[in-house]
Amino acid sequence: MTTTPTKPTTPVIFAGHMVYTHRFESGRTGSRFLRELRDNKKIMGLKCSKCNKVYVPPRSTCKECFSQLDKWVEVGSEGKLLTYTVLRVARDAEKDVLKKQLPVAYGIIKLDGTDTGFVHMLGEVDLDNIKIGMRVKAVFREDERKGNILDINYFKPVSKSRKR
């Protein structure tokens, strides 16, 4: 069989905007994590029985030794800010979810008792005063919690006058 080459054509490009509804299923591990946030204001992690790593958010398999994780542990609601970024422009979909005034800061937080970073918003902080290494703590929603990650409103700086 032979084919006859065709003359190349210029691609047609259509510019546009598409909005769609997305639903994320959190699975067995994620569901327990979210239920504890909603019902008890507790941040739970999964601990590896072989290498003792604690994961938040929890995962079902240890990324270090590939063991199945099934030992739930409560971790602290405070931790250390590992890094951060400031969002100054949001896409339309983000504006609906955040319902916050821009700019907004996001951080990766290593919660006390964990070995992993946890991404969340930072609040009650001047953006010019955010420092890597600063201590932060979770601020939970006081109104109806819904069983999603936004049951933690944000993480705020821990008062410097607090004794350790």
Residue ranges of model-derived segments:
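Well-ordered alpha/beta subsegment
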Residues: D115-R164
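Cys/His-coordinated zinc-binding microdomains
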Residues: S49-N52, F66
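Short, basic/aromatic beta-hairpin or loop at an interaction surface
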Residues: P103-F118
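Short, conserved beta-turn/loop elements at beta-strand boundaries and strand-helix junctions
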Residues: Y84-A90, D143
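Cys/His-enriched microdomains
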Residues: L46, S60, K131
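Cys/His-rich microdomains that often coordinate metals
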Residues: V54-Y55, L69, R88
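A broadly conserved sequence feature marking short terminus-proximal activation segments
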Residues: T2-M44, N153-P157
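Short metal-coordination and nucleic-acid-contact micro-motifs, chiefly zinc-binding Cys/His arrays
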Residues: K41-M44, P58, V75-S77
